[in-house]
Amino acid sequence: MPITSGADADEATDFETPMIKTDELRTARIDSLITPAELAERYPMTPAVADHVLDARRRIEKILNGDDPRLLVIIGPCSIHDPEAAVDYARRLARLREKYDSRLEIVMRTYFEKPRTVVGWKGLISDPDLNGSYRVNHGIEQARRLLLEVNALGVPTATEFLDMVVGQYISDLISWGAIGARTTESQIHREMASALSCPVGFKNGTDGNTRIAVDAIRAARTSHMFLSPDKHGRMTIYQTSGNPYGHIIMRGGKTPNYHAAAINEACEALREFNLPERLVVDFSHGNCQKQHRRQLDVCDDICEQIRAGSTALAGVMVESFIVEGTQKITSGTPLTYGQSITDPCLGWDDSETLLDRLAQAVESRL
C-alpha cells in the first residue's frame, strides 16, 4: 500500500479512524496521591528527631561492623494497624530501651506494607480503614505521623520496604530497613536498597535459600541507575552510590535456620565474597514454624550461641505486641486492642522476658 504524502495526507487525516485504546484496560483511577514533599511539609521532621535517626543509624552500623558488642533487637508488631496501640507499645519499649541500653540496641518494628503470597490485607498505608476502601493518602499520613511520634519518644524505627514509591514518604524517619523473603531476589528492590540511607537486611528466600540474600547484599553494595519519582512527584533518573550495610536476615524456610550449623553455613557463603560475617536472626516466620510462642525457644538457642562466643550474631527480630496472638478482621465486630491482625505475636509479658534473656546473654560479650 503506497504511503500517502502531501495534499493526499491532509485529506486522509479527515477520515482517520478514532484512536483505539490499548493501554490501561484493567485499571481505574482512585485518587491523586499527595507528593512526598507535600507530606513532609505537612508533617515535618524536627531537628531533634533528625539527630535521633542519624545517631541510631550510626549505632546500628557499628553493631553490624562488629565495632559495638551490643545486640541489635528489632521488635514490634507483625504489622501496624492501630496507631494508638502502636504508640502505647512504643512508650513501653522506650522504658526497656533505657533499661537495657548498655547491652541491647532496641528498635521498634513499624511495618506498614504487607507482602502477600496470594491475597490479604496489604497494610496500613494501602488500607488504613481495614475495609478495602484504599484511602492511601490517609494511610500514608498516619504512617508518617506515627513514625514522628515514635522517634520523638526516643525509639528508633524499622520497616520493610516493599512498594517502590512509599519509601520516598517515610525513609527519612527509618533507622533500619528490610527487604522481605519474597522480594530479596528482585532486581528493583536490590537497586532500591543500594539507594537507602539506612542499613538494610535481606531475608533468605521462603524456601530457606540464603544464597539469594548473599547475592542481594553484593548487588546493593554497588552503584545502580534506577527510575523513580522524586520528592515532588517528577519522574527522575537516579544514580546510587551503593549501601555498604547490607546483611542477611535468617528467617527460616521449610525448616528453621537459626541453629549454629546454619549460621556457620551462612557465614561461609559471606566469606566466599569477602562480606562481613554478621547477620540477624528472625525468631518468627520459618524459624518458629508459625508457632509464635516458639520465638522464646529460638531466643534460648541464640542466647546459648552468644554465650558460646558467636561473633556472627549482630541482631535478632521478634514479633511482639501488647496482647498475645492474632485476630481476624470481622465486619461489625470490634478489634481487640493491641493484638495483631496479621501474624501472631508474643504478648507484652513474654516480650519483657525475652528481652531480659537477651540482655543477660550479651553480658558475656562485654
Show the residue positions of the predicted features:
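Active-site-facing alpha/beta catalytic cores
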Residues: 18-24, 90, 103-258, 262-263, ...
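Internal helix-turn-beta structural module
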Residues: 321-364
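Conserved phosphate/anionic-ligand binding catalytic regions in large, soluble enzymes, centered on
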Residues: 72-85, 343
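Gly-rich Lys/Arg/Thr-decorated short loops/hinges at beta-loop-alpha junctions or inter-strand turns
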Residues: 36-44, 240-252, 335, 339
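Polybasic, low-complexity association/targeting segments
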Residues: 13-31
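N- or domain-start disorder-to-order transition segments that initiate the globular core
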Residues: 25-64
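Conserved, mostly hydrophobic/aromatic
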Residues: 76, 281, 347
